[in-house]
Regions:
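Long, low-complexity, intrinsically disordered polar/charged segments
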Residues: 13-15, 60, 178-183
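Gram-negative bacterial Sec-dependent N-terminal signal peptides
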Residues: 1-21
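A broadly conserved detector of short glycine/acidic/proline-rich loop/turn motifs that flank catalytic sites
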Residues: 11, 69-71, 415-417
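Residue-level micro-sites within transmembrane alpha helices that shape
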Residues: 2-3, 51, 174
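Outer-membrane beta-barrel porins/channels
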Residues: 22-39, 44, 103, 109-456
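Hydrophobic alpha-helical membrane context
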Residues: 15-16, 64, 185, 424
Length: 456
């Protein structure tokens, strides 16, 4: 039993790398026009370099550039409740603070007659940092249960834990667009994706009695993961006066990261009365061997998969008047066939479905306002949700505006937020203990953005 509890704690620490921001593995908000309208897959403006490359066949003749900056704030909290735990109730909220510095994205496009060439650089997957200053339930509950088995109740020792992780997928995309006739265009492209992440954490428990202050358990992990992948992209666009219909397909990106493990260690107080005098601690390779093949995935040089799923995006846009435009859009991410660590993708009920709508209105020649919404359904299951990686279905709302500074320059500003549905998971034999526990996963998300578009 003790070995099982210790394994649960170490495994939680070792899998902390799967914490990420954004969707399951994909971001779509690169340009500020998306943040203030959402449905942008039928656009012919500069942000089409990502959302509708084929649409650039009807875009600005010559060069265009766009530089965008976003600042996100997120919370990812876990409410844990274990009735009757160690003779009382265990109720604790673990606050996860997810943040990122200013997130930039750069767009460029050049069109001449029937040809267009475009590029985009940004954070295309995951994105951000997350930190739990008090660890997570997968740390605390099994360790407290293990120490209670050895006769040590919570008032006899100090417990501390910390977990933080980073997960970015940087992308550089290049497209070639061809106008086929007066109504149809097509584009092909490729995106290079670079995964850069780490997970660092510790769990420590020591006796409060002085002068001994004996360490009972100490777990440490510092693992950096990096890897490359490439995604071909095809898109098509139909344009007829006020109507635009588009489709874009991104192929699955295989990303196999390689560990650069700086620290992977366990030090455990030996409570076996027959051997404790000679070997007071189990540590080093001997301690890790107790956990079998499970820790092998986090050894230096080991590989972990973080595939980005294939994506189908279809949209229709319509200009009701020269001043009023609207669009509807649908995304399908085939998450069930994008390999994740431990094959977790197989536990999803289905791939991610997203429904988007947006409207934009030109007040005059200088100012534009817009708003939009998005519904995201991940197909989540209890088996998929983990302390170290969880998602919540959401509604997102965005608004903002644009200022045409002159004929060449446009300033975009935006704000959007996501309203998440809490996910409740109840588990018998919670974290390897004989108790039933319940976890409630919740999230918040707010993003402000500013960007400048420039036409040469």
């Amino acid at each position: 039993m003790m070995r099982k509890l210790l394994f649960s704690a170490l495994l939680a620490l070792a899998t902390a790398s799967t914490v990420h921001a954004g969707g399951l593995m994909t971001n779509t908000n690169y340009h500020i026009a998306f943040d203030r309208m959402f449905a942008r897959a039928a656009t012919t403006e500069i942000d089409a370099a990502y959302s509708n490359p084929a649409g650039l066949a009807w875009g600005h003749e010559g060069w265009q550039l766009s530089l965008n900056f976003q600042k996100p704030w997120q919370n990812r909290d876990i409410d844990c409740s274990v009735p009757g735990f160690l003779g009382s109730n265990f109720d604790k909220k673990y606050n996860g603070v997810a943040s990122a510095p200013i997130v930039p994205a750069l767009f460029a496009a050049y069109k001449k007659q029937n040809w267009a060439f475009s590029a985009m650089i940004g954070i295309v997957g995951s994105g951000g940092f997350v930190k739990y200053d008090e660890g997570i339930p997968m740390f605390e509950v099994p360790i407290r249960a293990m120490l209670a088995q050895a006769g040590m109740m919570p008032d006899k020792y100090n417990y501390s834990a910390n977990m933080k992780g980073k997960q970015y997928i940087y992308g550089a995309q290049f497209n070639i667009t061809r106008k086929i006739n007066d109504n149809f265009s097509a584009a092909i492209g490729i995106r290079a994706n670079y995964y850069d992440g780490y997970n660092r954490g510790f769990v420590n428990a020591n006796m409060t009695a002085v002068p001994n202050n004996i360490d009972l358990i100490d777990l440490q992990l510092d693992c950096i993961q990096r890897g490359w992948g490439f995604a071909p992209i095809v898109s098509f666009d139909y344009h007829n006066d006020n109507l635009t219909v588009s489709a874009r397909y991104e192929f699955r990106t295989k990303i196999a990261t390689e560990n650069d493990t700086r620290t992977l260690s366990a030090r455990i107080k030996n409570t076996d009365p027959q051997t404790a005098a000679q070997v007071p601690y189990i540590e080093g390779a001997t301690a890790l061997q107790q956990f079998g093949d499970k820790v092998a995935a986090y050894q230096d040089g080991a590989e972990t998969r973080y595939d980005m799923p294939s994506l189908l995006a279809v949209a229709v846009g319509y200009d009701f008047t020269p001043q009023l435009r609207a669009a509807l859009e649908y995304h399908f991410y085939d998450d069930k066939h994008a390999k994740m660590a431990g094959d977790r993708q197989k536990t999803l009920e289905h791939g991610t479905n997203e429904f988007l709508a947006g409207i934009e209105y030109d007040i005059n020649k200088k100012f534009t306002i817009s708003c939009g919404g998005q519904r995201t359904d991940y197909g989540l299951s209890d088996e998929y949700q983990q302390n170290t990686s969880f998602a919540c279905d959401s509604w997102s709302l965005g608004l903002g505006g644009a200022w045409n500074i002159n004929e060449k320059a446009r300033l975009n500003v935006s704000y959007f937020c996501s309203l998440y549905s809490d996910y409740t998971k109840t588990q018998a034999n919670y974290q390897g203990t004989p108790y039933t526990g319940t976890e409630i996963y919740s999230r918040t998300n707010h993003v402000i953005g500013v960007g400048i578009d420039y036409k040469f």
